[in-house]
Structure formats: C-alpha cells, structure tokens
Amino acid sequence: MLLGKDKNTNYRIGETTFVFWNTLQDDELLKNYQEATFTGLPFDGDFDEEEEATSTSKKEPAEKRDPEKETKVVIQALRSALGSKNAYIDREHSDRFYILALAPNAKRVSVKLWMEGTVSEIVGNTLAHLDDMNIVSFKGLLDEEIPPLRPIYRIMKAIYTATDSTKWPRQVVQELLESIIKGLPYPPALQMACLERIHHDHTSKYPVTELRAALLKAYLNRKHRKNPQIKQLTMALDKSNSNPAYLAGRLFALLERIQEKAIPGVKANITDRYFRTASATPGIIFGRLLQLSAFHLSKIKKEHGGLGFYFDRQIQEVLELLPGGQATFDKFFSPDQQSIFAVGYYHQKAYRDQKAEAEANEEEQETEN
C-alpha cells in the first residue's frame, strides 16, 4: 500500500501528500530518495540551521547518531542507483520512477502533480540538487564529495516563519519539487520568500543561515547556468569575485566583525540596525558604516594593535576589487543582487580566519614585550 503509514513511498507536507514508487520495487532506494528529497535524516528533520545556531537547549538526543556518516550512506546509495557520481543520466531506460501529489479538494482528493522519468533521471536530478545546494558550513567546513541533505521540508521551514506546514504555499512546494525532479531553475517565489525571511530575522544572531545561503546560491546558479557571461557562485569564499553585491556582503560581514571586537557584547550591532538597508539600498548606508567602523578600528588598534591593522588589510582587499577602490554601490539592489549580497556576507563570516586574528594579536604582544 503506497499510502500506508510509515511507508517509504509517501510523505505529507501541509495538506499535500506526495507518493513515489519505481518499477524496481527497491524499498531501500525509496527510503534513501525520501530522505534526500523530502524529509532529511530521521533525527534531524525537525531541526534546522537557524534553530541550531540560536538554540540554548542543552538536551542531548536519546540515541547518539552520526549525521555525516548517515548522510554519506544515503548519497552513496543514490549514486549506486545512478551508476557513479558523474554517470550519464539515462532518459530512455525501462526502469521507471513515478511521483504523484494528492491534495483534498472539497470532498474529493485531486491530483496536483504527476511526473515520471527513468530511475537514473529522477535520482540523478536529486543528486544534482544536493550538489547545487552544497556550501561551506558556518564553521568553515566543506565536503565537496558528500553534500549535506537539503530536503524540501527543511528548505520550506528555513524560509517561512510559519511552523505549521499547512500554512506554507502549496504551489511553492510543488514547484520546488518539480524543479528538483526535472533539474530546472528553482521557482522565483522561493528566492523572494528566502530574502523576506532573512530581512525578517535581521535582528537575530544569524539572519543568513547555512541553508538560506545555500538556497540563494543554488537559485542563482541554476537561473544563470546557461549564461557564460554570469559568474557562478562558489561553495566557499571567492576572493576573485568582483561582483559589487558580493563585495558589499563581504564588506558588511567584516564591519560586523570589527564592531564585535571593538565593543564585545554590544546589544544592538550593525546587523540588527542596518542589515536590511545595506542589502537593499547599499548606496545610502555604506559611507556611514565605514565612518562608524573607522572609530571601531581606532579602538582596536589602541587596545590590540596588530589586530586592527589586520582588519584594515581585510577591508582593503575587498575595496581594491571595487571600481576606484571605493565603497560606492548602487542606490538599490535587485532581488538577485540582494541574494548575492547574502551569499557574500555568509561566505565571509564562514571564512573568518581565527588563526590569522590570533597571530595578529600575538605579534602585537611580542612587540610590546
């Protein structure tokens, strides 16, 4: 029974039930597909990055699990079904994979979505989705071979404030699934919802979480993949990227870090006050932010010496990539530019070179001694 409870052949998001099966009748393949596409791993499906970053809970899981190891098992199993990591996606094979979306309509159940393809095609496109969504972790870790699982449930939970999945837009869920299955660009509504959530959370400690940054990066790369004139966003910090929006995001992250060092424990930092303005109307605010940062740098140089000059060099590295070496940005950023800003901001924060900061401090201490 495909709709049976706890079956690997269905998953419900809101009022929509997704049903999937294949001619191979391979339960293990269906389980791995369900976890990679819809649910995530059993122990992390209800816990996303922004919750992890801001949670104060000390509660440990009842059973010790290894998410990296179990993710690797899922990825390798799907690659085995495909043949290998870079195997040719066979769209003519007789082994078929089917996906159906059902939702209530008055007193009836209606078909909202129907898609089919070869097992190779469906599985291959899910793996492509995971590769596109791969990004450096907030702690600066990156595994290019085994990307994290980015299931639909966690994506939707990361970009909508509603915790009840029945309040998520059904059409967006279906369009996201269709884009994954067919290997198409993600729906624009996904980008807009993600940007709105980031702006909504600008006063939180982590407005741009790993998953949100991964989504915006993947959205833009898929959208522009066939345009060789547009540079693809990388998984980690790209110091050669001269896109003004990317540089604005990097610069904002640096200014935030400088303030953290100058005024530890500040109640309302520049992210709380200016993130939304800086990402949407950078031309209005960056001059003021740099003036503010000059005071912070002066304080750091007096108290920590070498660390202040280290931050100076970091800022100059970014400014040198801008026209005229000046932080002169457009008055307004488009949604795509705001997305690039968010990715640049996240990349810079994830890159934070704590070792270099520590060495800058040590150099100053040695000079004093």
Language model segments and positions:
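Extended alpha-helical scaffolding segments
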Residues: M1-N369
